[in-house]
Structure formats: C-alpha cells, structure tokens
C-alpha cells in the first residue's frame, strides 16, 4: 500500500473501512482515551475526532487516534499490502529487507549480484530530497502567537499531571554527527510554550543533547518536534534501521517515494515537508522540571523525575492541520499493537544472526518487550543459554527484556498452553534458570531495586541433552500416524 503522506494514508484507510470519523464533540480530557481504548480492544478502526473539546472550548484542529491500533494498519503504514488479513507475512518481508541492509552478504556470483542489485539501487535512490517550500510551513505562529492551548492535546488518565504530547517525532542532531536522530519521546505541557522532554539518558536525543553540552557549554540546543508525520517515518523511528541509512531514507523505501525534507525556519534541522504541525525551539542546559506522574504502557502511573524543558519558539503547520495522538495504558494499547507488528519484523533479523531460531514472540501482555519466548533447533548442550545472551545483546530493542524462555521447535510459542507444558515438564528450577544481575532495566520498571538497573532471568525449557542431565529423558506421546488417518476417514460416521 503506497501513499504520499499522512493525509493520503488516512484517505486510503477510510476507503478501506479502516478509519472512522467522529462528528460528535468529544473532550480531550479523558473521554477521548476511553473511546479510543474501547475501539482498540474491539479491533476497530483508526479514529478522526472532528470536533475535539478542551475545557469546554471547541478546538479547530481534529485529532487522529488509533492510527496503529491493529497490526494490519502497522503493515499498511510500512507500505505493505495486507491480503486476507495476513499481516505477518508482509512484515516478515520488511524484516528480511532490514536484515539484508544491516549485514549485506557479498554476492556469490554474477547471477547473485544481479539479483541483489535492484534492492541496493532502490535504497540508493531513496536518499531524501530537500525542498525550499513546504506544506508544513503554510501557517507560522511566532512570539505571543505560540500557544499550545490552541492544540487539542490529550489528557489521558485521571492521575496524569497535565496534558501530554504522545506521538511527537523529536528531531535532533549532535555536534559531531551529520545524520539527524529521530525519536518518539513524550512531552508534558507545563506552559503555553514549554514542555518537559522525557528522554532517557541512553536515547539518541539525550545523547545528542549531552554531546552538545560538552562541545558548546551554555549554548541552547536546537530541537524540533513533528506532530502528524507520515506513518513510514514514524515507524522508521521505532524500527532497528541500520546505521548505514537514515530513517528518512528507510521511510522512503517503505513508502515507495523519496522523503521530501524542508529546513526549519529557526535552525538547520530538517523535517518532512508534508508534516501536519512542527514545533521549533531549544533546550537550555539548566532548564529542568519534574515530569509526571503519567499512566504508562505498563498499566501503572510512573514515578516523578526531572527532565529537560523544551522551550517552543515557533509553531508551523499546514492549513487545516491534523493533530496525531495516542494513549498508553495496560495492554492492549496502541504500543502493544505496534509491538505485535514489529515482532514479525524482528524474526528475520534474529534468524540472520542465529539461524537455529525458528520463531520469536514478545507477548503484548508483557508490555511487548519485557518477556520473550523463543523456539529453536537445539544442536548441543548449553545452546539455549547462548541464544538467551545473544538476544539480550543483539538489538537495543531487547535491552530491557527481563525474561527469556527458550523452547524446542516442537512447541508453538504463540500458544501459552504449550509454553507452560514445556516449562513444567522440561525445566529444573535450579539447573535451567539463569540470573543476570546489574543489567539495564526499563526506567519505568518500579519492580527493579534501582531505577534503570536490575536483573534478568533466562529459562531453558528445551529437552536436555547428555551433559545437561544424567537421567533418561522423557519421550513425548504421539499417536500412530496411520491410526490418525484411519480415524479421520471414519470420523463422519461416528455420530460425534
């Protein structure tokens, strides 16, 4: 499914019955969250709230919600066609493309080189193109015009500290880097032109800010936030794109057309020309504020902590812009649906590094990253433990995975009944559990003894080989194949 920008994507979703317009007035304070949550849990469409209301005042800008509320729409956002509801297969193809780009193998001969050339050529041809004028700069607010109260920013949960910008694509660049960093960081509104930028210390934006402080102490750090970006660029920011290409280049590859970029009015940062709303401004080194609490994807309110304040100097936008928003809460929520889809992208990446892996699953109930189940073709004693540590260290997306369960390839890891059977019949609690202490842990994980630092557990639920056990290992009960065929033939005559 190829598309030009967010508006074209919305139009195509609506034509397919994947987007519903809400004409009735809906309050951005809690009501919008409740409606979006009910629709998402029912597997419903994306929502365009045409008449949002904030504090009793009608807002002029509509709100787009649940854009990635199903894995099917995530696949569509990645430019894939979803036939007969099968979203897994096209996303595996995206994963195979990423694995090729991440570690391209040298051609094995002239024929192989000829077959790989179209992919490489397409990647090279998708370098973004800079334009001088752009739809996202059709309207400009500066000075006293800058007022976040004019935007329909959601207040998602009763215990939230303030309205929260959720789907903001944050654009930064470190002093020693040519390439811009794109990241999704939530932002608490604390004034008409001030938000708290909640980026964790290891995230790209925070690293760029730290390097800027070291290289240019005391100088403001330019930051831009895009609200309402094309889906491919948003998804590129949360996908393990190889360092050899930019997120903008990868987005063009998904969308089937080069990403057009325009330089911001107040800095050299570049944003997609088709963006709906753009916030331009700076972060001052000594400007910090306590952020939170907020209801998060864990299903709990998080702790309050200090983060930098982003001062907005200018807001540019399209005529009649659309504000893109979401909420996070106990799974399933939109991040959980995104996690289900990205799970399929991860599988080919892992298999490229570990061919013995047959499947990989991040259950949404585990916040889509805290627990992983892996099936593999075991080849030697200790093999499961090697796979555990390999997953923890391979992609930064798995740095916060607290639990990894490894099973043999005879177990369907998408079926908890089979996983529990394997765990209860193939695991000795002492021999088959591996504990690793003092490892990076999600800052939001209040179960860890120290914020950002905790332990991980690996569980080897594979059949044990000689050397791993001294006992005779059990053989699974399997019915004779000929008997099963015979019963299949007579089944209709049994009156059952």
UniProtKB/Swiss-Prot annotation:
The pathway entry for this protein reads as: Cofactor biosynthesis; ubiquinone biosynthesis
Query: Which Gene Ontology molecular function entries are recorded, alphabetically?
Result: 3-octaprenyl-4-hydroxybenzoate carboxy-lyase activity; metal ion binding
Alphabetical list of Pfam families matching this protein: UbiD, UbiD_C, UbiD_N
As recorded in UniProt, its EC number(s) are 4.1.1.98
Which key words are in the record? Cell membrane, Decarboxylase, Flavoprotein, FMN, Lyase, Manganese, Membrane, Metal-binding, Ubiquinone biosynthesis
Q: How is the cofactor bound?
A: Binds 1 prenylated FMN per subunit.
List the InterPro entries hit by this protein, alphabetically. UbiD, UbiD-like_C, UbiD-like_N, UbiD_bacteria, UbiD_Rift_dom
Any one cellular-component term (Gene Ontology): cytosol
| Keyword presence, Metal-binding | yes
The record's Gene Ontology biological-process terms are: ubiquinone biosynthetic process
The record's comment on protein family reads: Belongs to the UbiD family.
The protein, known as: 3-octaprenyl-4-hydroxybenzoate carboxy-lyase
Query: Which source organism does the UniProt entry give?
Result: Azoarcus sp. (strain BH72)
């Amino acid at each position: 499914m190829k598309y030009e920008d967010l508006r074209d994507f919305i139009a195509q979703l609506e034509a397919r019955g994947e987007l519903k317009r809400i004409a009735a007035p809906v309050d951005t304070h809690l009501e919008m969250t409740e409606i979006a949550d009910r629709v998402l849990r029912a597997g419903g469409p994306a929502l365009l709230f045409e008449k949002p209301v904030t504090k009793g005042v009608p807002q002029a800008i509509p709100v787009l919600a649940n854009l990635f509320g199903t894995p099917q729409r995530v696949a569509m956002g990645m430019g894939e066609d979803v036939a007969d509801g099968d979203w897994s297969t096209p996303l595996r193809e995206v994963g195979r493309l990423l694995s090729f780009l991440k570690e391209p193998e040298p051609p094995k001969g002239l024929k192989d080189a000829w077959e790989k050339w179209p992919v490489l050529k397409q990647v090279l041809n998708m370098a973004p193109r800079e334009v001088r004028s752009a739809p996202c700069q059709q309207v400009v607010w500066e000075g006293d015009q800058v007022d976040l109260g004019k935007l329909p920013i959601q207040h998602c949960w009763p215990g939230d500290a303030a309205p929260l910008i959720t789907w903001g694509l944050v654009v930064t660049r470190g002093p020693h880097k040519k390439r811009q960093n794109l990241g999704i960081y939530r932002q608490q509104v604390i004034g008409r032109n001030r938000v708290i930028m909640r980026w964790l210390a290891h995230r790209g934006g925070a690293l760029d800010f730290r390097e800027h402080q070291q290289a240019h102490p005391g100088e403001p750090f330019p930051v831009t936030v895009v609200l309402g970006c094309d889906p491919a660029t948003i998804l590129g920011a949360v996908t393990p794109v190889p360092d050899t290409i930019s997120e903008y280049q990868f987005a063009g590859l998904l969308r089937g057309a080069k990403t057009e970029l325009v330089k911001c009015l107040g800095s050299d940062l570049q944003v997609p020309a088709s963006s709906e709303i753009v916030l331009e401004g700076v972060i001052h080194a000594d400007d910090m504020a306590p952020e939170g609490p907020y209801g998060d994807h864990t299903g709990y309110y998080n702790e309050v902590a200090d983060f930098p304040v982003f001062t907005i100097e200018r807001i540019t936008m399209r005529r009649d812009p659309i504000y893109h928003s979401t909420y996070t809460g106990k799974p399933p929520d939109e991040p959980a649906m995104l996690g289900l889809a990205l799970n399929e992208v991860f599988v080919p990446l892992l298999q490229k590094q570990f061919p013995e892996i047959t499947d990989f699953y991040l259950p949404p109930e585990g916040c889509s990253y805290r627990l992983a189940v892996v099936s593999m073709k075991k080849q030697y004693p200790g093999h499961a433990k090697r796979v555990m540590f390999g997953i923890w260290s391979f992609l930064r997306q798995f740095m916060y995975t607290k639990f990894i369960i490894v099973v043999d390839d005879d177990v369907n890891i998408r079926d908890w009944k089979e996983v529990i059977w394997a765990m209860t019949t193939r695991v000795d609690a002492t021999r088959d559990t591996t504990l690793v202490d003092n490892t990076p842990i999600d800052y939001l994980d209040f179960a860890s003894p120290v914020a950002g630092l905790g332990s991980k557990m690996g569980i080897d639920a594979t059949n044990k080989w000689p050397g791993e056990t001294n006992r005779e290992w059990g053989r699974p009960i399997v019915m004779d194949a000929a008997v099963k065929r015979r019963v299949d033939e007579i089944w209709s005559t049994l009156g059952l």
